[in-house]
């Protein structure tokens, strides 16, 4: 089965709550079929049998974590919620470490002869790491050739000599890049061989029976946790309990303002079908994916602001340069509060989150960096 089909099957649902899709076939001209269909519809439910358990770790900085392996994968596979603490995003540390230490006896290939999903992910992570190293090597090689050209110019070289040297350098860089591409697979195989050797510190990862300790957990952003308990009844805590963990009961509006604004933005894009992930990697609040990280790169970087806040040009230009360098679109998301601060904090303390979040209005502006050489019209 191809990678695309595997992902389509694995990430079938965009949210942890699934639609009711086990209803019987409806025969239009048969009244009994209508009655049976209505009965099954009335009895069906899409509520989770066992809600996801979360733990709160830390005093000064609160970490909201999910410890159970199955629940971690469930949240990731159904909406890409959370981040593995020892992984890039999906919590794959356990599978990667078991494979490296030879603890997993499950065959890595399925009946079709293709690689399993776990092995594919491990290979991709290794390839990504290797490509980062190769990019550094390529930059060093390019800088070396640029120094040669600079030396020629300092010596007063003729223009024809420069052209000949430039052509040689371009050809040298092409061959260097081609060699790097061929070396990716070889290096990955060498890593597989070298990683099979146990290190001294690996003994600390195993319990008395030789099984891998469950060290990795899935960490949720506060806004993700609120969404999974307020918008969707997925977590085993209530919105009021979560709010009490995040802020003290006597909190002022200025204490909760940043969180409320961030959640309003998060809920806004989730409700429009976007997969929302943390954007700290690109200096913004959120990244927006059409489906999720396994399918394509994020298209938009979102920065949340109050509707009456204006930054200087340097602030906008700095973020736009980072976002533009990653080939993404920069979105300024302005949030306006429609009620007073006193009313907002009163709604928060009374746990009336529905009315509180509905009292904010969201507006968006696409920011595009103006380049004189490209924007002449």
Curated annotation (Swiss-Prot):
Entry's Gene Ontology BP terms: tRNA processing; tRNA-type intron splice site recognition and cleavage
Reactions that this protein is recorded to catalyse: pretRNA = a 3'-half-tRNA molecule with a 5'-OH end + a 5'-half-tRNA molecule with a 2',3'-cyclic phosphate end + an intron with a 2',3'-cyclic phosphate and a 5'-hydroxyl terminus
Active-site residues, Swiss-Prot/TrEMBL: 289, 297, 328
Name of the molecule in the record: tRNA-splicing endonuclease subunit SEN2
Species of provenance: Saccharomyces cerevisiae (strain ATCC 204508 / S288c) (Baker's yeast)
NCBIfam families linked: endA (TIGR00324)
Gene: SEN2
Miscellaneous comment in the UniProt entry for this protein: The tRNA splicing endonuclease complex is present with 100 molecules/cell.
GO CC terms in record: cytoplasm; endomembrane system; mitochondrial outer membrane; mitochondrion; peroxisome; tRNA-intron endonuclease complex
CDD domains (alphabetical): tRNA-intron_lyase_C (cd22363)
This protein's record includes keyword Lyase: yes
Keyword Nucleotide-binding: no
InterPro entries xrefs: tRNA_endonuc-like_dom_sf, tRNA_intron_Endo_cat-like_sf, tRNA_intron_Endonuc_cat-like, tRNA_splic, tRNA_splic_SEN2
Top-level taxon of the source organism: Eukaryota
Coiled coil start-end: 119-174
Cell compartment(s), UniProt: Nucleus; Endomembrane system; Mitochondrion outer membrane
GO MF term list: lyase activity; nucleic acid binding; tRNA-intron endonuclease activity
């Amino acid at each position: 089965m191809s990678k695309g089909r595997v992902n389509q099957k694995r990430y079938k649902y965009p949210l942890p709550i699934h639609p009711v899709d086990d209803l019987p076939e409806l025969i239009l001209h048969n009244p009994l079929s209508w009655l049976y269909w209505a009965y099954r519809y009335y009895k069906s439910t899409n509520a989770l049998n066992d809600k996801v358990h979360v733990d709160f770790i830390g005093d000064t900085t609160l970490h909201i974590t999910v410890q159970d392996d199955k629940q971690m994968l469930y949240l990731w596979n159904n909406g890409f919620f959370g981040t593995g603490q020892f992984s890039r995003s999906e919590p794959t540390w356990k599978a990667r470490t078991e494979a490296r230490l030879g603890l997993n006896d499950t065959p890595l290939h399925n009946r079709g002869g293709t690689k399993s999903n776990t092995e594919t992910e491990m290979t991709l992570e290794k390839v990504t790491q290797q490509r980062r190293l190769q990019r550094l090597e390529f930059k060093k090689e390019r800088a070396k050739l640029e120094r040669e050209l600079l030396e020629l110019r300092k010596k007063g070289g003729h223009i024809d000599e420069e052209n000949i040297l430039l052509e040689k350098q371009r050809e040298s860089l092409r061959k260097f890049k081609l060699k790097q591409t061929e070396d990716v697979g070889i290096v990955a195989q060498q890593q597989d061989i070298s990683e099979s050797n146990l290190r001294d510190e690996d003994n600390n990862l195993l319990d008395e029976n030789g099984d891998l300790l469950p060290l990795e957990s899935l960490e949720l952003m506060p806004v993700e946790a609120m969404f999974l308990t307020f918008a969707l009844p997925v977590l085993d805590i209530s919105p009021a309990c979560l709010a009490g963990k995040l802020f003290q009961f006597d909190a002022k509006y200025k204490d909760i303002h940043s969180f409320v604004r961030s959640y309003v933005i998060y809920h806004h894009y989730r409700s429009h079908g976007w997969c929302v992930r943390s954007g700290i990697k690109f200096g913004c609040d959120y990244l927006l994916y059409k489906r999720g990280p396994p399918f394509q790169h994020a298209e938009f970087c979102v920065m949340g602001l109050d509707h009456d806040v204006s930054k200087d040009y340097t602030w906008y230009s700095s973020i736009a340069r980072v976002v533009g360098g990653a080939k993404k679109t920069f979105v300024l998301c302005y949030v306006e509060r429609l009620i007073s601060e006193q009313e907002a904090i009163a709604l928060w303390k009374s746990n009336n989150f529905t009315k509180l979040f509905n009292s904010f209005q969201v507006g968006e502006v696409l920011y595009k960096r103006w380049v004189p050489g490209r924007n002449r019209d």
